[in-house]
Curated annotation (Swiss-Prot):
Binding-site positions, ATP: K124, W127, A129, R131, R187, W189, C190, E197, R199, R213, D252, D266, N268
Residues holding Mg(2+): D266, N268
Superkingdom of origin organism: Eukaryota
Similarity-based family: Belongs to the CDC123 family.
Keyword ATP-binding: yes
Compartment(s) of residence: Cytoplasm
Name of the protein described by the UniProt record: Translation initiation factor eIF2 assembly protein
GO cellular component: cytoplasm
Single biological process term from Gene Ontology: eukaryotic translation initiation factor 2 complex assembly
């Protein structure tokens, strides 16, 4: 018998109502002074939802409107289509694609109008932002300057698909999304320092812990922890709790320099589906309420350099081969991958040479 102790798995139930309360259009209306300027397009048309769910990405090509994403490609020997690609197209069952200019022209125009009003924007649906799809844009961020960038970012995101298809997954009162209305949020773009974003866990109206959202090491954070906690205490107890209908939730905040203001980035369900970052959910669930209502929670920070985290780009696992992700963190792995690549190219050249000799 091993003497190792095991921690009992603590159940953390979440209801559909709690998830709905974390929808941006719900909570942002309660705290307008603490959120960036944004435009919310409510009750998105079904055709737009189908557009996001369909295979491939169909971008609109408007007359008298130039976009780098829809410029005509001049065919040459390097990019010309092969005969087998044409054959595959004819053999594939025809499926009518949803096109923005045809199927939801009014929404398309509203998106363009919002961009004209706000300038660059960062999009999100009811709950999720497409942070996993930034690889598809040249700037590698969620910053969208034109409507086609919005379409690319939303179409390429697994997080967006989760909102559309599995929004209530894990809810104790059912996960059916029938009749759910979806909103598109366009938040005015601002460059935020990821080191100054924090996630706060509130259980039964008490703060039980807080953590960095960006898991890299920043040497100046520790000496500012008391300042951060004072601002977190203030926004949770004086701003959020008096109006928010639930007493347990996970709050994301941003505290920019000179550290005298705090903004709400998001409100998430108090549930395992929300990333606990530097904590574990069992750890959070097991924290007892404070005695005499005096809160003394931990603001957990990365306390030492972690070269692995610095070398890895957030969500990079979503869009490049795992071999490359691992190689980027290990110089020896890079050399090994390069050698394998050279061997593959050499083998390919030999096979092509052999095929040419057989043909002659």
């Amino acid at each position: 018998m091993s003497s190792q102790e095991y921690t009992t798995f603590i159940d953390i139930p979440v209801t559909r109502a709690q998830v709905e309360h974390c929808s941006y259009s719900f909570w942002s209306s309660l705290y307008p002074k603490y959120v960036p300027k944004s435009i919310v397009l409510k009750s998105l048309p079904k055709k737009f939802i189908q557009y996001l769910e369909q295979d491939g990405i169909k971008l609109p090509q408007e007359e008298n409107s130039r976009s780098v994403y829809t410029e005509e490609i001049i065919r040459n020997e390097d990019n010309d289509y092969s005969d087998w690609e044409d054959d595959e197209d004819t053999a594939t069952e025809f499926v009518q694609e949803v096109e923005p200019l045809i199927d939801f022209p009014e929404l398309h125009q509203k998106l363009k109008d919002a961009l004209n009003e706000l300038g660059a924007v960062a999009p999100k649906l009811n709950w999720s932002a497409p942070r996993d799809a930034t690889w598809i844009l040249p700037n590698n961020t969620m910053k969208c300057n034109e409507v086609n960038e919005l379409y690319l970012l939303l179409n390429a995101s697994n997080y967006i698909m989760h909102d559309l298809q599995r929004a209530f997954k894990g809810c104790v009162d059912g996960d059916d999304i029938k009749g759910l209305k979806f909103d598109l949020v366009l938040r005015q773009w601002c460059d935020m320092n990821p080191a100054l974003e924090f996630r706060v866990f509130v259980k039964n109206a008490h703060i039980v812990g807080a953590t960095q959202r960006d898991l890299n090491y920043y040497d100046y954070l520790d000496e500012l922890s008391d300042t951060f906690k004072d601002l977190i205490d203030e926004i949770v107890h004086d701003v959020v709790l008096p109006k928010f209908p639930d007493k347990s939730f996970v709050l994301d905040v941003y505290i920019p320099r000179p550290f005298n203001k705090i903004f709400i980035v998001d409100i998430n369900p108090f549930a395992r589906k929300t990333d606990s970052l530097l904590f574990s959910w069992n750890e959070i669930a097991a924290i007892a309420p404070p005695k005499n209502d005096v809160e003394d929670y931990e603001l957990r920070l990365v306390t030492r350099h972690n070269t692995g985290r610095f070398a890895s780009k957030e969500h990079s696992e979503n869009h490049v081969p795992q071999d490359l992700v691992e190689a980027s963190l290990n110089p020896e792995a890079i050399r090994e991958l390069t050698q394998k690549w050279k061997e593959l190219l050499s083998q390919q050249a030999k096979e092509e040479s052999s095929d040419s000799e057989n043909e002659t």
